Amino acid sequence: QIGMLATVMNCIYVSEMFRSTGMKTAILTPFMCGSVTELFSKDLANRYFEDGTVVFFAGGTGHPYFSTDTGIVLRAIEMDADAIYLAKAIDGVYDSDPKTNPAAKKYDEISIDEVINKKLAVIDMTASVMCMEHKMPLVVFGLNEKESIVNTYNGNFNGTRVTV
C-alpha cells in the first residue's frame, strides 16, 4: 500500500510542476486521499479532459497485490488512451538490468510481444499482457533527465517505444 501512496506523492510533485507553468491539473485516485486528489470516475476524467486539464492517475488499482503499473494500464484502457507514457528511474527498456550490467543494451523500439517473451522488466507481466491484449503502446523514458517530460511530450526523448 505504500507503493500506491508513493504514486500519489509523485503525481502531486509533477502536478505542481505543471501548475507552476500555468497548466490546469487534477489527480484522480481509486481511494479518497484528503483534499489533494479526487475519486476516479471515467466521467470526471473526461470532464477534466474536455476542459483542457492535465489528469494524473495515481494510486494504482487501489487494491493490494496489483502493481501500480497494472493500475495505470487499466486506467489507460478505460480512458481509451492512445498510449501510456512511463517516466521511470532508467531511461528506457534494456536487454538486462543496466544497474547490474554495464554492458546492457537499450532498445529504441521493441514490441510488447518481445517484452513479454524476453521477460524484460519494463512493467510487470500482468500489465504487459494487458497492453498486448488491448493494443496499448508504451513510451518509456527516464524521469531523471533534465526536461524529460517536456522533451517526451514534444517527441524529442531518449527512451524506448514499445509497440503493439
Q: Language-model segments: what does each one mean?
A:
Residues 1-164:
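C-terminal catalytic "cap/lid" subdomain
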